[in-house]
Curated annotation (Swiss-Prot):
PROSITE patterns in the cross-refs: AP_NUCLEASE_F2_1, AP_NUCLEASE_F2_2, AP_NUCLEASE_F2_3, AP_NUCLEASE_F2_4
Keyword DNA damage: yes
Annotated Zn(2+) 2 binding sites: 145, 179, 214, 259
Cofactor: Zn(2+)
Protein name: Probable endonuclease 4
Positions annotated to bind Zn(2+) 3: 182, 227, 229
TM stretches of this protein: none
GO biological process, one term: base-excision repair
Organism phylogeny: Bacteria, Bacillati, Bacillota, Bacilli, Bacillales
């Protein structure tokens, strides 16, 4: 099973450090931002220590890199032309950086927000942006992420994702990242009807479009449209449904990426939960007490 988490690509070790962090969690895949997600500052590709990282990945059984595009990319913006043009040009740069990592197959992208113009207008704008970016020669696919429906986010329904894909000329370079927290918060019933949700996705989008799974529990009840991640088994989705998802026959080949919150009462000393969460999801054994020394409460 390909399972891992978001890891940091920063400091002197860059991608090598990210691979070392992933290995410390027992991961077999990992997700990185190629720079800070909230700005456009980027280190040169030559500084990322890619050859050393690829060797370390091979030695430690880390099969694949998932790249996440920065949050500042909003292809759905219809009110500020400069924001849209920045999104288009910067996404193109991020694709080239992802390709340079060699082990990356997908770059996850939040489709965008219409900022008040409405879903139909926003979808058209996203299609326009993707058609400007994609040439058909890309070595990585843009994985459109399913969204929770917070604010004016586009991508909260499978129909919206399908509409974007249908409008893009080189849509063979598009895939989908299914985020469990987002799908739950958008109203889909992963707890009682996982097969029904996947059948609906297959009918509307196509199950073969799935490229990445973001595995997150949710602090919110189903349909809340709030997008607040929780540690595996401690949220409203629960451990058993998430365990079923990561082991589902139709999803077995996909990289599963955890984006759950760090643990600890002191904001300066919080620690990553990923080693424990990966181990629990692999084994199927949920430990409701493992956070106690760090947070002081169980579920």
């Amino acid at each position: 099973m390909k399972i891992g988490s978001h890891v940091s690509l920063s400091g002197k070790k860059m991608l090598l450090g990210a691979s070392e962090e992933a290995a410390s969690y027992g991961a077999t895949t990992m997700m990185v931002y190629t720079g800070a997600p909230q700005n456009t500052r980027r280190k040169p590709i030559s500084d990322l220590r890619i050859p050393e990282a690829l060797l370390h990945m091979e030695e430690n059984g880390i099969e694949e890199i998932v790249v996440h595009a920065p949050y500042i990319i909003n292809l759905g913006n219809t009110t500020k032309p400069e924001t849209f043009e920045l999104a288009v040009s910067f996404l193109g740069e991020e694709i080239r950086r992802a390709e340079a990592l060699e082990k990356a197959k997908h770059i996850v992208l939040h489709p965008g927000a219409h900022v008040g113009a409405g879903e139909e207008v926003g979808i058209k704008r996203i299609i326009e942006g993707l058609n400007e970016v994609l040439t058909g020669d890309e070595k990585v696919k843009i994985a459109l992420e399913t969204m929770a429906g917070k604010g004016s986010e586009i991508g909260k329904t499978f129909e919206e994702i399908a509409a974007i894909i249908a409008g893009v000329t080189h849509n063979d370079r598009l895939s989908v990242c299914l985020d469990t927290c987002h799908v739950h918060d958008a109203g889909y019933d992963l707890i009682h009807d996982l097969d029904g949700v996947l059948e609906s996705f297959d009918r509307i989008v196509g199950i073969n479009r799935l490229g990445v799974i973001h595995v997150n529990d949710s602090k919110n009840i189903r349909g809340a449209k709030k997008d607040r991640h929780e540690n595996i088994g401690f949220g409203e989705i629960g451990f058993d449904p998430l365990h079923r998802i990561v082991h589902h026959r139709d999803l077995a080949h996909l990289p599963k990426i955890l984006e759950t919150p760090y643990i600890g009462l002191d904001p300066r000393k919080k620690v990553a939960p990923y080693r424990e969460e990966i181990a629990m999801l692999r084994s199927g054994n949920f430990d409701a007490e493992w956070r106690l020394p760090l947070i002081g409460t169980s579920i």
